[in-house]
Each structure stands twice: as C-alpha cells, then as structure tokens.
Amino acid sequence: MVKEDEILPKYWYNIIPDLPKPLPPPRDPQGAYFSRIDLLRSILPKEVLRQQFTIERYIKIPEEVRDRYLSIGRPTPLFRAKRLEEYLKTPARIYFKYEGATPTGSHKINTAIPQAYFAKEEGIEHVVTETGAGQWGTAVALAASMYNMKSTIFMVKVSYEQKPMRRSIMQLYGANVYASPTNLTEYGRKILETNPQHPGSLGIAMSEAIEYALKNEFRYLVGSVLDVVLLHQSVIGQETITQLDLLGEDADILIGCVGGGSNFGGFTYPFIGNKKGKRYIAVSSAEIPKFSKGEYKYDFPDSAGLLPLVKMITLGKDYVPPPIYAGGLRYHGVAPTLSLLTKEGIVEWREYNEREIFEAAKIFIENQGIVPAPESAHAIRAVVDEAIEARKNNERKVIVFNLSGHGLLDLSNYESMMKRLNGNG
C-alpha cells in the first residue's frame, strides 16, 4: 500500500529549463516613468518573487507547506471514467485527476498555501488578490485564514452577481469581498465613470487588487499566468505521473482547460518535462477566442498596465470578455510558458462554446456523478471528442484530463444553461 506522503512530491517542477527555446523575459514599456519589474518587489512576497525568476528545475517544497497539502487532501484522487467510456462506446481508457476534492473545490489552493506561507514568514498581516469565478479568491481566503492573515478579494462583477455562494464561502473564511470594478481604487473609479454597468474582467480586478495592495502596503497573491503559479501547480502533474505508474498506465493524450494557464500547466508540464504523453491539448472558450484570434506579442497581464510586459498569446489588455458562465476563463491572455509551447507546436488547442461544453458536462454528470465546474467542462468536451475519434479509429488510447474543480456552487448557472439546451430559455 503506497502512502499519501509518497505520492505527494517533495519538489515543485519548473519547466523553464526544459522549454524548446529561451522564454522571452518580462520587460518594462518604453518610456515608462516607473519600473513595473521593480514594482513586483513592492507587492509580492520575497520568496514568491525569487521563485518567479528562478531557472532552477526543481524547488524544494517547505515541510510546512507539504503538511498543509496533506491536510487539505493531497494527493487528490485519480479516477477512471469507466461509465463514460461505456456510454461513448470507446476503446480508449479515460482517467481524470480530481482537483475538486480539495476543501475549496479546485486546484487553486495548491499555490495559495505556499504564497500565504511565504507572506506570513515575512510578517505580512494582510493579503490582496482578484478572482473571476471565485475559486482563486476562495483559496486565498482559506490560505490566509490558515496563517491568521486578513484577506481582501476583488471579484469580477458578473461573477459576484452570478455566483453568490462563492462570495459567501470567501466571507465564511474571513475575507472582505468586493465586486470589481469598485470605487475603492483609482482604476476602478475610472472604469465606472466610463461605464457604470461594466461587467468587470479578470484584468480589471487584477489591476484593482495590485493598486489596493500598493496603496495600503499589503502583499498581492497571484492566481495564474505568472511562472511561479505554474511552478506550484506542478504537484498536480507529478502526482498524476506517480498514480498512473502505480496503475501500469502511460498517458497518450493529456487535456486541461485554460483561463490563464495554471491548471493546464501544473497538470501537463511534468509530463512534457519527463517526455511522457504524446499529445497535450489546451481547451478554452470560443466566446473568448484567445487561441484562434489572439496575437503572440508583449502585453500587460493586467488591464491597467501595472505589471511588467510579458510575451504571450493575448487578445489585448483592454479586451472586455463577454459574461460567460465559466468566469475563470474570462481572461485576455495565456501564460508566457504555455504561449511559447503552443507557438512551438508542442501544445495543441481547442475552443468550444457554452452549448458544447454544457452538453458534455451533462453527459459526464449522468455517467460519473460529479458536477464539474463550467471551466472544467471545456476539458470534458475535448475528452469526449477524442474518445469518439478513438472509437472511429479503433485506437486503445489512454486519455487523461484534469478536472480542475467541482461545480456545486455553480448550480444556478447549470439551471439556466439546461433551460437553454431544452429550448425553454
């Protein structure tokens, strides 16, 4: 019997040394009156900043953080989706890594815990962040409470209104939660003056959180896109490799959804670095067509342009995403490392619309009994398509996907979408 402690890795994995070409470095905009790179030193915990710029392949996980990981249910389970296989009549074997098993219901806690730990080690008492659908905000709220810190969360307005239970759980963990754009920041007030009914976006909420942290000398915790986040999330893929080895399986296809890229990177990068798996498929929203219509160029990760420019696939920092149910995918860009891997042809991409992903989610729910987050349902749609393709070609492939979170706090969204699918809405 293998112990949980033996499956949970002792090191985070950093893909940067194993990329096919050097990652274009962050930079300041030409003629800038202040350095965005220097700004990071004012808002990020020191160890988080160090890990953001490291080129070491492996970073030791502090024992305190490993203990916290074990306490929240890591390693998370790897399940075989046998009933889904039977429903699709596919010879493929389908497995999913279930990050919804954590207390906060998603993968986000994997980086919230170490970032909060490093902040507390510095004597920080208050942390700030943004959240889209609420998964990241929930993770930060819990991690902050673990280390007796206060937290402030700027939640994208459309999700704040669509997902009141997400808001409630953050408040239960002790967080102050605000609908972004707000009147608390100069940038938020500027947006509201232009459009008082602005639905908000992750880029705007990120800008507000950074400004608020700077103004109050708090620390900002980052939820996606930056390299340090994908580093921490590598526990997902490393656990999955070990769990597949224990089953005697080798993955052929690895699939995950993409908002900024943290769950996909955390899941697939250990496979890519170890040359395991043959195909890697990143799945995003057709309503926010960053892969099909985005440009690979230097752009700001946040809408106000407070963070350094990074080279990534982007729809532009001023892009306003439509108010889709998968709030965690409402982001204009793709993590720089994932952007590079996509441009180099190592990672494939897919984009699906809401109807397509909710149809796939319904099939998954009926057969596996787990309600996926709308974001994760994008990955499920790609899994269904790949399984059907395997059936057509009679290929006994092993398909593994990351089910990044549960949708039990998104049931009102499911109800609305089911009415539309049934022609009643």
Swiss-Prot record:
Alphabetical UniProt keywords: Amino-acid biosynthesis, Aromatic amino acid biosynthesis, Lyase, Pyridoxal phosphate, Tryptophan biosynthesis
Top-level taxon of origin: Archaea
Cofactor: pyridoxal 5'-phosphate
Pfam family, one: PALP
Annotated pathway: Amino-acid biosynthesis; L-tryptophan biosynthesis; L-tryptophan from chorismate: step 5/5
UniProt GO MF annotations: L-serine hydro-lyase (adding indole, L-tryptophan-forming) activity; pyridoxal phosphate binding; tryptophan synthase activity
Keyword field contains DNA damage: no
EC class name: lyase
Reaction catalyzed: (1S,2R)-1-C-(indol-3-yl)glycerol 3-phosphate + L-serine = D-glyceraldehyde 3-phosphate + L-tryptophan + H2O
EC code(s) of this entry: 4.2.1.20
InterPro entries per record: Trp_synth_b-like, Trp_synth_b_CS, Trp_synth_beta, Trp_synth_beta/beta-like, TrpB-like_PALP, TrpB-like_PALP_sf
Keyword Protein biosynthesis: no
Modified residues (N6-(pyridoxal phosphate)lysine): 108
GO biological process terms, semicolon-separated: L-tryptophan biosynthetic process
Family in the record: Belongs to the TrpB family.
Stored PANTHER family: TRYPTOPHAN SYNTHASE (PTHR48077:SF6), TRYPTOPHAN SYNTHASE-RELATED (PTHR48077)
Job description of the protein: The beta subunit is responsible for the synthesis of L-tryptophan from indole and L-serine.
Subunit annotation: Tetramer of two alpha and two beta chains.
Entry protein name: Tryptophan synthase beta chain 1
Originating species: Saccharolobus solfataricus (strain ATCC 35092 / DSM 1617 / JCM 11322 / P2) (Sulfolobus solfataricus)
Source lineage: Archaea, Thermoproteota, Thermoprotei, Sulfolobales, Sulfolobaceae
Designated gene of the protein: trpB1
